[in-house]
Structures are given as C-alpha cells and as structure tokens.
Amino acid sequence: RQRQMCIRDRGYKTVFFGGPMDEEMVAEATGYMQTRPIIATGHFAIGGLAAAMRRCCLIITNDSGPMHVAISQKVPIVAMYGPSNPKLYGPYTKDAVIVTAQPPCQGCADGMKHSCDDLQCMSRMTVEQVVAAAEKMLEK
C-alpha cells in the first residue's frame, strides 16, 4: 500500500507483468491496493513483453528473465535481489538500482543451490528500501 501511494501521488500507474503462474500472487497484491492496477499477467510472449515494458518509465522486478528484458529495452529498473548475487547475474547497466537485504549468506543461490530455510534475504527487504530506490530512479 505504501508503494502504491508513492506511485499514485506522482501520477504513475501500476502494471503487473508475469506469467499465468503469477496470477494468484498478483491477485493477492492487488487486494491491498486502493486504485486498480493494470494486470497483464499471462498476456505476453517475450516479444510482447519487451514491447509493453518499453512503454514503462520504471520496472520494479526481482532478479529474473523479465528484468533482463526491461534492461534490453533501456527501461530503468529497481532490481530486488534475494539469494542470487547481482555481481554474477547483473543488471549490468547504469539505469538500475539494486535492492538487497544484504544477509551474510547472499550468493547461496549461485549454481542454483539454495542452502537456507528462512530466506532472510527476502524477509529482511523492506517496502521502504524499494520505494526509496524507485524514487531515486524516477528523479533521474
């Protein structure tokens, strides 16, 4: 809700991208929102996703394939990193801010081997960190 208020107050709209497997998570997230977002989960193949992202002024994403699609379209991003290492996986662009909880175990997913059960790398990340990163990118 805090993130949406920040974005709404600036006149931006929220768009959710993702595959069909993301629809339940997106439905849950939209339940916390005061204004209706654009829901585009399950609507695009890779080329369509690239074209749709190109129209965005900022993408907030996790370390995923769509993050790299946004980068390929030269869209500024806020990339949330959990267990994977941004030095290894990118983003390799000046148009990105990386948000991480910086747990002592970061990098445990290198080679796709997750070695913890509590995912401190995700649970310690805050809305405030992501909002601050988004504001920084939107001010550029």
Predicted regions and their residues:
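Donor-binding and catalytic core of enzymes assembling or modifying cell-surface/extracellular glycoconjugates
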Residues: 4, 8-82
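Nucleotide-sugar donor-binding patch of glycosyltransferase catalytic domains
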Residues: 31-32, 39-40, 71-140
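Interdomain hinge/lid region at the active-site interface
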Residues: 1
